[in-house]
Design a protein with these regions (language model features):
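Extracytoplasmic ligand-binding site segments that recognize negatively charged/polar headgroups
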Residues: 51-58, 77-81, 94-232, 264-266
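Periplasmic-binding protein-like
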Residues: 173-180, 293-316
Length: 355
């Protein structure tokens, strides 16, 4: 069974939770929070630093434990805090694997030398190359798309075709958006920057800021609730928040637009949940078994269905409630570029003054 340990304390208080360079992070080690040495030496146990909600990953790890007998200890915190913590702990980290909801954070961890390159045929057969690092030091597990959710009583679907449309004045006081600290917002803005350039992206962000006003939320589920209740007409969220809401409230007046699908459009913005083995791990073979379990068809199906995400294994079908993956295009900005795009994106977000 997956054991839920005390959540990690954040190791940074930066507004946008920037990744701290390794030398600076080294000063942040808190020895009292490290796992006991007996835990570190347990051959039948893995420690996973997870940026994913516990309820969405614990059942998968429980299934892995039932199959292999290997226990998984799950320590949860924000993705940026986890990467900074790995830097601070260095070779003394108890973590065997890092699991995050953002490819950019995984690529930053890879670039900082925190993850171990892998040679695994199971991974290369199961997960297409665009969803993993070139050296397999991180591997995508499931996909999510940044979409427009709208209230069907307030909006007609042909009123919106692009995310950029949401910056138009007609959506003044009708729009809800994530706050500026959202990893999803930061990754989405990075893709828009890479596609359209800084000038157009800045105008887009200024429009979002003005149109949303006070309708800025910490949780994407709050955005979906606001749209469902008619407090606003439209919002920007990852797709699965809408389908999760509809699973419990099927009559809610909600629908999804996969944006930017017109000819010449950038395509829907995609990110992945992914995992990598930490370089200092002493349980590499067991960690590989976990990754092998997660990329196999059964693991992919379970992992994706828990949160209405898109499996990355080409032979595993998504929940039929979701928009058919073959019916829309994804943006062409490589996931591995999200790391290099991040800092300039945060600077632009700050300049615009998003809340």
């Amino acid at each position: 069974m997956a054991t839920l340990l005390k959540p990690l304390r954040p190791v940074t208080t930066y507004r946008h939770r920037r990744i701290i360079p390794a030398p600076a992070a080294g000063f942040l080690i808190l020895v009292s929070l490290l796992m006991p040495q007996a835990e570190l030496l347990a051959a039948d146990k893995l420690v996973v630093y997870s940026g994913r909600a516990e309820r969405l990953i614990k059942p998968v790890f429980d299934a892995f434990t039932a199959k292999t007998g290997i226990q998984v200890d799950l320590l949860s915190s924000g993705t940026t805090e986890l990467v900074n913590r790995l830097k601070a702990e260095g070779d003394r980290t108890p973590a065997d694997l890092l699991l995050t909801n953002d490819a950019g954070s995984l690529e930053l961890a890879r670039g900082a030398g925190l993850l171990r390159p892998l040679n695994m045929r199971e991974v290369e057969r199961a997960i297409p190359s665009q969803f993993r690092a070139a050296d397999n030091s991180w591997v995508g597990l499931s996909g999510r798309f940044w979409i427009i959710v709208y209230n069907t009583a307030m909006v007609k679907p042909d009123q919106l075709t692009s995310l950029l449309d949401l910056a138009n004045p007609q959506w003044k006081d009708k729009l809800a958006i994530p706050n500026s600290g959202s990893e999803y917002l930061q990754a989405g803005v990075s893709v828009i920057r890479a596609t359209h350039g800084d000038e157009r992206t800045k105008k887009f962000l200024e429009g979002l800021r003005d149109n949303a006003g006070s309708q800025v939320y910490q949780k994407s589920s709050q955005i979906v609730d606001a749209v469902a209740k008619g407090q606003v007409a439209v919002g920007i969220v990852n797709h699965y928040y809408v389908y999760r809401h509809l699973a419990t409230q099927p009559t809610a007046p909600l629908a999804v637009i996969m944006p930017d699908q017109k000819e010449g459009g950038m395509g829907a913005i995609m990110n992945v949940t992914g995992i990598g083995i930490t370089k200092p791990s002493t349980h590499v073979e067991n960690a590989k078994l976990l990754i092998e379990f997660l990329v196999a068809q059964a693991g992919q199906k379970m992992f994706a269905d828990l949160d209405k995400e898109y499996p990355l294994h080409p032979e595993v079908k998504a929940d039929p409630a979701l928009v058919d993956r073959k019916s829309f295009r994804a943006a062409q900005v490589p996931l591995t570029r999200l790391a290099e795009l991040r800092e300039p994106t945060l600077t632009l977000i700050e300049q615009v003054g998003l809340r």
